[in-house]
Amino acid sequence: MLRSERDPQPGQDIRGRRGCEPVKREDFTTLTAACAKCGTCRTVCTLYPERKAEISVARGKITLVEAAFSDRDGNAEALQEALSDCILCGKCERECPNQVAVEEIIMKGRADLAEKLGIPAWKQVVFGKVMPSVTARNATRTAATAAQKVFLRRVPTGSGLHYRFPEAFGLSGRTVPALPGKSFLGSLPPGEAVRGEVVLFVGCVFDHVFPQVGRAAYETLRLSGKGISVFRDAPCCGLPALVSGDRLSALRCVEENVKRLSDASPERIVFPCGSCLVMFRRNMLFLLPSGHPLHGEAVRVADRCVDYASFLLETDVLSRLPDRPKGEWAGQVGYHDPCHLSGTLGKGPEGREVLRRTVGDSYSELRGAELCCGYGGTFNIRDYPTSAKIGQNKVSVAAGGGAAVIATACSGCILQMRDMAARTDPSLRVVHIAELVSKAFSNR
């Protein structure tokens, strides 16, 4: 049985709701039984080269989970530390010969441990109060915009103005993008609720931090000739809460999104962010399993979800672009494979095809395109030095291959690589593919 070295702190009450019950021992046994302890995971683990420890790889974590749910005593804090020390890049799961559901094991383990040991107060506020509410997110962005001008130092980079934390903050010189005065959704004229053939789910980061991405995606989607509407008051997709173990907050976001999108019944739901997409296509079904009242609706919603690049190719939007003049784009433009989008969902070729057709001769395969950027959501907060080391290697390899612009389709990857570029090569630009598509159309 799991034991704790301290008295369990009160966490959120997440019992009694289907899809949110603590995982039973037999469920973990079923998930972990497929692991043959072959060690393939160690050869591809993003963290192992930094940690050099068995506990950092899937095999080690699964062994700990098995021990915790056996007759042997298990230390809850030690297991929580081990399961938290993972970027969730999914490389181990994709390369596993037995297809062990590593990410599911880790996410469910984190959730059960969060219930036992409690969820930190700041996470309860962010995941339970801010992320589900558009009003709360807007208020948070307004406060953060004012605070960064007072406490942080301005740093110009190739990807735009950033702010750097002073060393006194203990954040090792981390940079963050300058927050705009208005969010993407805040810049739209008043409109109706979700409707139309196609719905754009812009996501929190592309609404508040990089509104130019939301705007570029919206403007280029409209060229498809389809009726496009924006999910204006959507809760967060729920992924940050889920991977942090806050099952209840994640479930609240997921249930609201499924109900709203099911009622609207669009043909397609388009996601500029690969992390939001993987939440809808796969992870939300961990929370709404067979037997949950919303399971059927969740499956139908998931089937309609598509990434931005795939939608452009489906609707042949790029056929309207003229041939691009040779040398129009300054320097080589390459595509970074986001772990969630390219790895988990297999959507790498689509992004490359959009990029080739957009920038023409300037496209070049990115050196180290498949390398993880090291962001990992809350992992970047939990262990910034390690996250930054992995990220700096990523952008250094790409720049060393001649890249002047890195294009991708994940908000976390863009946040991370812009931060790393500000450290290693401020001239290196990191953009979303929608920004390049929008620029190409504006230059017609």
Predicted feature descriptions by range:
Residues A36, T40-A67, Q80, D85-D112, ...:
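Iron-sulfur cluster-binding cysteine motifs and their immediate structural context
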Residues R3, V102-R444:
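Iron-sulfur cluster-binding electron-transfer modules in prokaryotic oxidoreductases
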Residues A33, K52-S56, A241-L248:
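Alpha-helix capping and helix-loop boundary segments enriched in small/acidic/polar residues
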Residues F28-T30, T46, K91, V199-G203, ...:
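Glycine- and acidic
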Residues C20-K37, E66-L88, W329, G334, ...:
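Ferredoxin-like iron-sulfur electron-transfer modules
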Residues M1-T30:
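Conserved glycine-rich FAD pyrophosphate-binding loop
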